[in-house]
Amino acid sequence: MRFIDQTEIFVKAGDGGDGMVAFRREKYVPAGGPAGGNGGRGGSVILQASTQLQTLLDFKYKHQFVAEDGKRGGPKNLTGASGQDRLIEVPCGTVIYDADSMTLLGDLTTNGQTLTVAQGGKGGLGNKHFLSNRNRAPEHALPGLPGEEFRLHLELKLLAEVGIIGLPNAGKSTLISVLSAARPKIADYPFTTLIPNLGVVPRATGDGTVFADIPGLIEGAHEGVGLGHDFLRHVERTRLLVHLVDATAEDPEQDYQTIQKELSAYGQGLQNRPQLLVLNKIDAMDSEQLLEKQACLEQMSGSPVYLISAVAQQGLDTLLQQVWEELDRLPNDLQEAPIPVLDSPILRET
């Protein structure tokens, strides 16, 4: 399945139904008063988060969404039927912006959460509302008001507790594949992974923790180099980062610093996100060189460095145990705070 994590759509709420001009014409009321009903309200356009969707791919092929118009008012003071709302399902983690101003409108993070993005137009008044002492038989009614319409920019930020980061070819995809049932594309060249991969890693408690393999970051990622903005966006919601460094690289310390600089330059507090620092591919190193690189990296980072080989599945139990301990220790609200919904009569949570 192709991964799409941002797109634009057009939404149009239904127009309100027109009010009606009608008069009472019962058998014993030959000259009855006005009895035209109001038009029905137009349907609204509502976004709803769903765990059944993992990508915005559906919106690649369908960009326009229109709700139903309200029906015209009827005789005998009958109000026209309201138009049916248009419900649009999006993946959990979708952030919604006004595409023209890039004003933040809302953030749908939980299954079933909704946001009304375009309100249906009000129905027009029937002629019964224009009865007065001076006009006992009004022959006019009001048309319904048009429904709102907007262009929306949708962005998907993955909801994963643990993000695996590192330079291209550090072994992130291999790690997530051996820890979970995820099967990302794996090859021995940089930038094999061009989309984030999600995997659920089981715990002894019976629970599962979602890991995200973030595609390789490079120098300049915070400025958008190498799709850096697209990749870093998915780190924002993680509670814990597993920073993978290739032990066979010429300068692991420099590789570590490169990623740290990009996290810091991107902002959003990513440089302060809790991390576990990991040297991967230890099966390809002799022990003396490995211990030297581990010591240098620990001295530079001020953190313990865990040794693993994702391919040979060495050191994974120790790493996972540390991941579980960190997650249990960290507060659940460490995940990025939900983006507030714009306080507007037009765009609001429902």
Swiss-Prot record:
GTP binds at residues 166-173, 191-195, 213-216, 280-283, 309-311. GO terms for molecular function: GTP binding; GTPase activity; magnesium ion binding. Residues 160-328 form the OBG-type G domain. Residues 1-159 form the Obg domain. Mg(2+) binds at residues 173, 193. Keywords: Cytoplasm, GTP-binding, Hydrolase, Magnesium, Metal-binding, Nucleotide-binding. InterPro entries: G_OBG, GTP-bd, GTP-bd_Obg/CgtA, GTP1-OBG_CS, GTP1_OBG_dom, GTP1_OBG_dom_sf, OBG_GTPase, P-loop_NTPase. It is an enzyme of class 3 (hydrolase). It is found in: Cytoplasm. It comes from the Bacteria. SUPFAM superfamilies: Obg GTP-binding protein N-terminal domain, P-loop containing nucleoside triphosphate hydrolases. Monomer. NCBIfam families: Obg_CgtA, PRK12297.1, PRK12299.1, small_GTP. This is GTPase Obg. The gene is obg.
